[in-house]
Amino acid sequence: MIATNSEIQDGMRIDWNIPIKMDDGLVLRADIFRPIDSGRYPVILTYGPYAKGLSFQKGYPSAWERMVEEHPDVAAGSTNKYQNWEVVDPEKWVPDDYVCVRVDSRGCGYSPGFVDPFSPRETLDFANCIEWAGTQDWSNGKVGLNGVSYYGINQWQVASLQPKYLTAMCVWEGASDWYRDMTHHGGILST
């Protein structure tokens, strides 16, 4: 059994390993960072395979060092304890009254199952998470997506399902056409 807990830390209410039941019965796990005061807030949701609990500094130390060296403003104003690969820093968004939700995709991190990147099942799971986030008592029903690369590509795919509560997407470096964007730039096979 995976333990869930809630705590107030660094000016946020943090809910760890919250279960989200999928339409096929599998339970995915999410970490939720939200304002301390009760209320209904817009949600920034990410869904992906890179372990929601793995800090940027530990998982990708050379990338972290390069980022803070070249872009010190990214780390400024944050303890950086909750920085995670290619997603928003909740310490920068929660003070402006957003809820940040990070979901480990099926078979990754604390979520059971088998990894099947960019599959119809993964896209449906992502849509289920959006619908879940839009109906929570801390949500105002507006769910936005944000993320780089994998987290951007899966945004294009889930948007095709038109989840009811999806209201915004911020795609960074997310290919929407594998042929043109990834494998055949200008029609020529990229190696």
Q: Over which residues does each language-model region extend?
A:
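N-terminal cap/lid segment of alpha/beta-hydrolase-fold proteins
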Residues: 2-39, 43
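A catalytic-pocket lid/entrance helix-loop region that shapes and gates access to the active site
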Residues: 58, 64-69, 121, 146, ...
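Conserved alpha/beta-hydrolase
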Residues: 74, 90-110
